[in-house]
């Protein structure tokens, strides 16, 4: 019985000690602050960084991307794996080098997908759509057709 009581006390102590840490690393929905998405994405989307530095040299990141109805991202690849969870709305995803709406699959809220490095894919939002993306820094978009890259030319 002493061992069980000790285990309970130790667990409670660890839980209490972790509370400040959890509070510093957690966000209620109203605490997520969106701003303009980076220029390598088409205009109109908003982005919130939850964890890490997506543009940093290396490391994990977690972001949320809010897209308006009809928002489209042309076929592209990433050098690292990308994990995507649909939080609201509908994300349509297609595979290949050409944007073809007839070949897209719709994923509603609660859906999860992961895209392996260098996988050719494209996406569109149906209704306002929010996705959470987790991956490795730095985020890079390699558009299949360079003319589709919305990044301002220097």
Labelled PLM ranges:
Residues 1-7:
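Positively charged n-region of N-terminal signal peptides that target proteins for export
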Residues 7-18:
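Bacterial N-terminal signal peptides
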Residues 20-59, 146-154:
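A short, N-terminal "cap"/entry segment at the start of jelly-roll beta-barrel domains
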Residues 25, 102, 124-154:
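Double-stranded beta-helix
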Residues 41, 54-60, 74-85:
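His-enriched metal-coordination microenvironments in redox/metal-binding proteins
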Residues 53-55, 68, 97-118:
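Short acidic-glycine-tyrosine-enriched beta hairpin
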Residues 73-75, 93-94, 115, 120-126:
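Short beta-strand His + acidic residue motifs that chelate non-heme Fe in jelly-roll/DSBH
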